[in-house]
Amino acid sequence: RSRGLGDVYKRQVEGINRLAFTDADWAGRQYIIDRMTDAGLSIEIDDFGNVIGYKSGKKPELPVVMVGSHTDSVPNGGNYDGVVGVLSAIEVIRSMIDDGYEHDHTIAVVDFMCEESGRFGNATLGSKAMRGELTVQDLHRLVDKQGISLYEALKGRNLNPDGIEIMKYKRPVKSFTEIHIEQGKVLEHERKTIGIVTGIAAPERFYVTIRGNADHSGATPMNLRHDALCGASKIILGIEEIASMQEEPPVVGTVGVVEVTPGAMNVIPGAVKLGVDIRSISKAARDSVVTLVKEFIDITAEKRGLSYTIETIAQDQPVEMHPAMIREIEEAVKSVGVEYMTMPSGAGHDAMHWAEVVPTGMIFIPCRDGISHNPAEFAEMDDIVTGADVLDKVLRKLSLEETKLV
């Protein structure tokens, strides 16, 4: 079924391009709605566009057992990131219905909108919306490269951005589970089929705009230049060095956006905008690196006669998975009979926003060579099926009233 979803992706030679709220994203979302309907789920769409499919339990008054992931992509992305989680959950529900499996708690399968930060620079927006963590001001503030705000994107899809501050998911939730490709090389290297996630790292993201003088490249001597790009280059290397110095717990730092103005060969760069992502499983370690990076930016700018501004766009919190959920997943893996390991997640996921309020667990499957956010992203079908089998056992048990998460 992931191949079927791939057919509606805006797929080009360079990969999957299904950025949030684009036509390609909306076509993929409709595919998920169709698959949920085919599986016998009742569909609910919230004001942010999140798709929620329900399989009713015998006791609908009980808190729902939630499972989900996302189906939007980064620019030029792969065919498995997020998709494995949503389609696996739907197939588990289909299996339950085929088996006539009866359970107490209603199960909610969610396709979260705008999990990727590729369009608006801020990740997991759909789950943030469901958790009541967004404001109308946020929707106006987040703008894509074409100058379209998230508010406008929602309006363009006939959604209700003005209701964002009162759209927090109202039903009580017993648990949240997400299955995902690892997006790293650890499982493959350790020859393990399943990873049981113990915690999720989270990023602090900010834009740094460095300003110098856009002078003539031929008429300005080297000793009289204020080259914003040279300063930015020094800052990029400084971020790499500072993050590398923090060994335990580790911190990673990435500059994934570089915009140079005016961008002409005969003009010294007058301004450079950098998009910086610094993340760790430890908030204290991450905050320490962010502080050092900002101090380094200040020193570099002063030495080179440059000015700068910093705009923080995200400060997500690292979270731990619930011990009871880790135990439930471990029990399911053992019953399936495959090799597994416990591990942290370096990448952020929708699960991190539910972990703050309900027992949450994550299941990883390997991806080839650890490649993700890339057209070469690939997961073996046997691993996907094994992961779905584990998820099936977890959800069947969680959906029983007698299963207590303590």
State what each model feature region is:
Residues 114-115, 121-283:
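Midchain, well-structured core segments that form catalytic/ion-binding scaffolds
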Residues 1-9:
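Single conserved hydrophobic/aromatic residue that forms the stacking wall/gate
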Residues 67, 76-116, 204-210, 216, ...:
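Alpha-helical metal-binding/catalytic segments enriched in His/Glu/Asp
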Residues 14-56:
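A non-catalytic alpha/beta surface segment that caps or lines the substrate-entry region
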Residues 7, 68-69, 340-390:
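Zn-dependent metallopeptidase/amidohydrolase metal-coordination segment
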